Amino acid sequence: MPIGGVQSWTATVGRELQRLGHEVAFWGPERPLPAGRFDAGVVANVPHTRAALARCGRVLVVSHGIIPDEGPAGERVAYTSEGVRDRWKGAGPILRQPIDLAFWTQTDAPRRFLTRFSYRRGLDFLPALAKRMGLQFRHVADLPPLDARAALRESAVVLATGRAALEAMACGAPVVICDNRKYQGPLLDPDTLGAMARNYSGRGGVVPTPANVAEAVQRAMGAGSLRSHVEAHHDARAVTQQILEAMAC
């Protein structure tokens, strides 16, 4: 499963809906549409998923980003952050990124790594920065969830954005919001908790350099674990209930 993104969101919410007793069909535009009709549908990326809308009695569109594919459509729309909603000048509810806190957990494993948790490249100064700070460098780019979780549990600090940043927080790792994103280039958001309003994307931040990333890493390690932040704002159980309420189910 890719790091972060719609697939992880869908799997997390779908499992929670199943736990609550709902029958759930998972679908993506690369697959044939399931037969029959559905009481409700939760969809994103409407330019690619529009064919499914007519199969659903009611639809909630979740707008999760700033590019055209991720925009709002239809009558029931929710947004994953204030920044996303402002980008589209929308008025729907905010549904925070849902994280499975029963899976993404912390342990007492030694934390020896400065970890970059992203499928993206760039930020080539990070291995040298980790060495100067007495840490080993690890780039987690394509590990399955169990292996990614093990790596996060061994991380003294994690550089990530979006859902990946939240999964790292849930594993007890200090987090720096930093990545090299396709549409905005390299970004560092020094306000980790304030980044919630910006979907932890790095937007509105500064260009990362060895000096300001080192400062952000030291500050994050001083602040420590942010699991309590994820528990307060991103628990998949609470977010799924909010989804049902937004759909009037």
PLM-predicted stretches and their roles:
Residues 5, 203-248:
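A charged, aromatic-enriched C-terminal amphipathic alpha-helix characteristic of glycosyltransferases
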Residues 164-224:
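Catalytic binding pocket for nucleotide-activated donors in carbohydrate/polymer assembly enzymes
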Residues 150-166, 173-174:
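Acidic donor-binding loop of glycosyltransferase active sites
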